[in-house]
């Protein structure tokens, strides 16, 4: 009976966090609409080998993450829920693996369940895990690699050991096909230090080749197939997407070495008060409990590895939160009955965070705020109140944990619930018009659907148009963006129209049908009306503008 009650409560908890909100939030550009459109095109054209984006070659990522997204759209259709369910599915399987590993380590269901809950409610995990990007998928394979190696390392028989190493290779191979060679590097930097500390390096040399073989076997069919269809894929993917992005001085997303420290602290909310003690406990237990050191290696070593890279994004450290969640849960349970101040500190941090964030919404972002250009307009008072309420709910849960003391410290898992349910309803119109063009496109849907040609000046905007209109022939106007490589192929000629050539291009193509030009305006575009032909219709909302040119004989 008790188990049934817990199962029902967990199901409700999971649905409120990870299922109900998915359809309630508009898709964000460029990331979510990009992956939505790539998978839509794969389902339409049936090519599950070569990624295409707006009918152009798109070699920034391998294929396996798209496969998971494809299945989501195949099962649930073309909607926001279907776009995001691949990420949710991946992060859910990761949580189940976290449960499995914690159970193997501590032999306690309560610790294992709490580890999964901590993982699912860490702010970074929830934010990325309910967002349509590929990081949840690669996290799944890295967590699977972490569990597979532990299975091999603790096996009682040679068969189990061999199976564990083979599973490790399969997980790494799938990670490689999801996000690239980092899926091979991360397990190495996490496992090798632990093996050296345990004086088992010889075992690594003996069984490691099994993992390499299984990784090669699972990746070979696709790797060979795409090399045959697109001979330049591996050159571009390895040198441009890996070497330039992570090592060269002009890498994308450059950030200082310490960049991930604040990301880790913010991402560990609402459990960050337990973080110092959890890491310290893992180090203190390193001799008598090799599992604690193993989790510590999987937390710290990838973090250092990503910190050394030139290019950095918060999503890169998502895999670190799986072992960290187990350490946090283990530490929390250990100190719950000892009168430790860490649980009180964690509750106070949540109260402070919720109150400060609510005050920031009311005093800074609101139309009466202290800044000269508030984020919310005067017509969005309800959004201000909802946003503040979401953070005040966070603070209220923190206060409840503080009052209840060590007995109910696990209630911190409810802190992000207000944000989870209300996030889609509190996005300011300024942000919607810039980053969520779906509502703008819906307003001009009839015009766009009857246009023979549709042009967009940003890749993110173009992908949203393609997704909403269910057509992949959107033309790029004036800016290549991330599709510069795909546009360089001879068969992509005519897919890009330069601003200086637009008048001539328009006069030629209006004979074939009407033309819609959709732009997201920047400061450089303030005089755009003077540089393009006068339209037959114009629709302007926020930073988004539609110019419509009817067909001419």
Curated annotation (Swiss-Prot):
Which cellular component, as a GO term, is one annotated location?
A: plasma membrane
* Entry keyword Ligase: no
Provide the membrane topology annotation.
Answer: Multi-pass membrane protein
Q: In terms of domain of life, where is this protein from?
A: Bacteria
Q: Name one GO molecular function term.
A: mannosyltransferase activity
Per its record, the protein catalyses: 4-amino-4-deoxy-alpha-L-arabinopyranosyl di-trans,octa-cis-undecaprenyl phosphate + lipid IVA = lipid IIA + di-trans,octa-cis-undecaprenyl phosphate
Any Gene Ontology biological process = protein O-linked glycosylation
Chain segments annotated as coiled-coil in the UniProt record = none
Q: What is its EC number?
A: 2.4.2.43
Q: Pathway listed for it?
A: Lipopolysaccharide metabolism; 4-amino-4-deoxy-beta-L-arabinose-lipid A biosynthesis
Chief subcellular location: membrane
* Record field: transmembrane: 8-28, 81-101, 113-133, 136-156, 176-196, 204-224, 255-275, 289-309, 313-333, 351-371, 384-404, 412-432
Subcellular location per the Swiss-Prot or TrEMBL entry: Cell inner membrane
- Enzyme class, top EC level, equals transferase
Q: Give the record's keywords alphabetically.
A: Cell inner membrane, Cell membrane, Glycosyltransferase, Lipid A biosynthesis, Lipid biosynthesis, Lipid metabolism, Lipopolysaccharide biosynthesis, Membrane, Transferase, Transmembrane, Transmembrane helix
Which family does this protein fall into?
Answer: Belongs to the glycosyltransferase 83 family.
What's its job?
A: Catalyzes the transfer of the L-Ara4N moiety of the glycolipid undecaprenyl phosphate-alpha-L-Ara4N to lipid A. The modified arabinose is attached to lipid A and is required for resistance to polymyxin and cationic antimicrobial peptides.
Record-linked HAMAP family? ArnT_transfer
Name-wise, this protein is Undecaprenyl phosphate-alpha-4-amino-4-deoxy-L-arabinose arabinosyl transferase
Q: Which gene encodes it?
A: arnT
């Amino acid at each position: 009976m008790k188990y049934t009650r817990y199962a029902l409560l967990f199901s409700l908890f999971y649905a409120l966090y990870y299922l109900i909100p998915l359809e309630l939030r508009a898709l964000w550009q460029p990331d979510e609409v990009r992956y939505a459109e790539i998978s839509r095109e794969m389902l339409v054209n049936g090519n599950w080998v070569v990624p295409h984006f707006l009918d152009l070659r798109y070699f920034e990522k391998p294929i396996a993450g798209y496969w998971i997204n494809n299945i989501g759209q195949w099962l649930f259709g073309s909607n926001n829920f279907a776009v995001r369910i691949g990420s949710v599915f991946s992060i859910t399987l990761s949580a189940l693996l976290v449960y499995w590993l914690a159970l193997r380590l501590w032999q306690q269901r309560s610790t294992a369940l709490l580890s999964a809950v901590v993982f699912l409610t860490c702010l970074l995990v929830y934010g990325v895990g309910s967002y349509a990007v590929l990081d949840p998928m690669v996290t799944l394979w890295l967590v699977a690699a972490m569990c597979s190696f532990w299975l091999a390392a603790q096996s009682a028989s040679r068969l189990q050991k061999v199976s564990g190493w083979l599973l490790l290779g399969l997980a790494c191979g799938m990670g490689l096909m999801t996000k690239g060679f980092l899926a091979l590097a991360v397990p190495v930097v996490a496992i090798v230090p632990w093996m050296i500390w345990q004086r088992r390096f010889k075992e690594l040399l003996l069984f490691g080749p099994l993992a390499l073989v299984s990784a090669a076997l699972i990746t070979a069919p696709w790797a060979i197939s795409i090399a045959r269809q697109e001979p330049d894929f591996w050159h571009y993917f390895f040198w441009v997407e890996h070497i330039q992005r992570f090592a060269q001085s002009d890498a994308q997303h450059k950030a200082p070495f310490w960049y991930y420290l604040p990301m880790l602290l913010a991402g560990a909310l609402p459990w960050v008060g337990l973080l110092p003690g959890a890491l310290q406990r893992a180090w203190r237990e390193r001799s008598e409990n090799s599992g604690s050191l193993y989790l510590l290696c999987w937390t710290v070593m990838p973090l250092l590895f990503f910190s050394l890279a030139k290019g950095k994004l918060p999503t890169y450290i998502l895999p670190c939160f799986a072992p960290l969640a187990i350490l946090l849960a283990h530490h929390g349970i250990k100190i719950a009955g000892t009168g430790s101040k860490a649980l009180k500190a964690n509750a106070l941090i949540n109260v402070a965070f919720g109150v400060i964030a609510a005050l920031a919404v009311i005093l800074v972002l609101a139309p009466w705020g202290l800044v000269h250009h508030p984020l919310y307009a005067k017509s969005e008072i309800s959004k201000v109140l909802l946003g503040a309420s979401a953070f005040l709910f966070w603070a209220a849960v923190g206060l409840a944990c503080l009052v209840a003391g060590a007995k109910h410290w696990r209630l911190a898992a409810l802190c992000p619930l207000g944000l989870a349910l209300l996030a889609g309803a509190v996005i300011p119109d300024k942000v919607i018009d810039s980053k969520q063009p779906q509502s703008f496109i819906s307003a001009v849907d009839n015009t766009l659907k009857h246009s023979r040609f549709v042009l967009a000046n940003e890749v993110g905007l173009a992908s949203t148009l393609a997704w909403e209109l269910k057509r992949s022939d959107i033309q790029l106007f004036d800016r290549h963006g991330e599709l510069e490589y795909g546009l360089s192929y001879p068969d992509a000629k005519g897919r890009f129209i330069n601003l200086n050539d637009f008048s001539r291009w328009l006069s030629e193509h209006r004979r074939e049908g009407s033309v819609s030009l959709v732009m997201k305006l920047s400061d450089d575009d303030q005089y755009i009306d003077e540089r393009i032909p006068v339209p037959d219709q114009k629709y302007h909302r926020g930073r988004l503008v539609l110019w419509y040119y009817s067909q001419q004989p």
